[in-house]
Design a protein with these regions (language model features):
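Signature of N6-adenine DNA methyltransferases within the class I
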Residues: 1-45
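Polybasic, glycine- and aromatic-enriched phosphate-binding surface used to engage nucleic acids
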Residues: 31-234
């Protein structure tokens, strides 16, 4: 807000910086404009163009309490929720109060679980202590798994991704570049599947290059993303 004594400010922005084929950006500051410009220059594929799909986890905990269990037993599959994503890694089980296993009749199992494989998980709601809006990690398993409704997951036709591609996607999504870009066009803390469908992602060869440098520290993640996506070789 401004008082009557505040000098108003204005910015001239090129039309193409605001209106794109996918949505309208509002780069209110120079930092916003730079975030959009960088992403536009170095990233140009949608998930659909890469052959991938993003969906929301199928299990709504309060609706399926009878299918959720605190302890493992024969036939149960992992029930993965947002609390299992920590530091770019999915840790399961971790001994939380929330049920960590899912089991039901065969018909429901087919409906609510996904086959084993590598999936990129993204929290739909970021926690207060998390600095980034988008928090991502890779889940990898041989057996089936159930994902909580508070998670989005990237897959290929309902099955897992190439593990290398999944790792590259997680590195990209956890970068500061993506966080700054996401904040330009999304004013809320929720990350919807629709938002992810509209975003731009690196090409497959770039994702494989990112996967060779899987790191945990934010500074290292950002350095790798800059190195791979902004390099002349990656942009050829």
């Amino acid at each position: 807000s401004f008082d009557h004594n505040t000098e108003p400010s204005s910015r001239k922005v090129d039309y193409l910086e605001i209106v794109t084929p996918d949505f309208i950006h509002v780069p209110a500051t120079e930092k916003d404009a730079e975030a959009v410009a960088w992403m536009t220059a170095h990233v140009n594929s949608t998930l659909a163009e890469l052959g991938f799909t993003v969906s929301t986890g199928r299990v709504v905990d309060f609706r399926f309490r009878e299918m959720l269990h605190n302890d493992y037993f024969d036939g149960a599959v992992p029930m993965v929720n947002a609390s299992h994503l920590r530091g770019g890694i999915v840790r399961h089980p971790i001994g939380t109060k929330k049920p960590e296993w899912f089991h039901s009749d065969p018909e429901s199992m087919v409906k609510f679980v996904v086959p084993g494989g590598s999936y990129v998980l993204i929290k739909r709601f970021s926690a207060k202590e998390e600095k980034r809006r988008i928090v991502s990690a890779v889940w990898c398993s041989e057996g089936s798994v159930a994902f909580d409704n508070k998670l989005n997951y990237i897959h290929k036709d309902g099955h897992g991704l190439d593990p290398e591609i999944a790792a590259g996607l997680a590195v990209f999504l956890n970068s500061t570049r993506v966080d700054e870009y996401f904040r330009v066009f999304s004013g809320h803390t929720q990350v919807n599947a629709t938002d992810l469908r509209m975003m731009r992602f690196p090409r497959l060869e770039q994702l494989r290059a990112l996967a060779k440098h899987v790191v945990a520290e934010q500074q290292d993640i950002d350095s790798v993303v800059e190195q791979v996506l902004a390099s002349e070789e990656a942009c050829e």
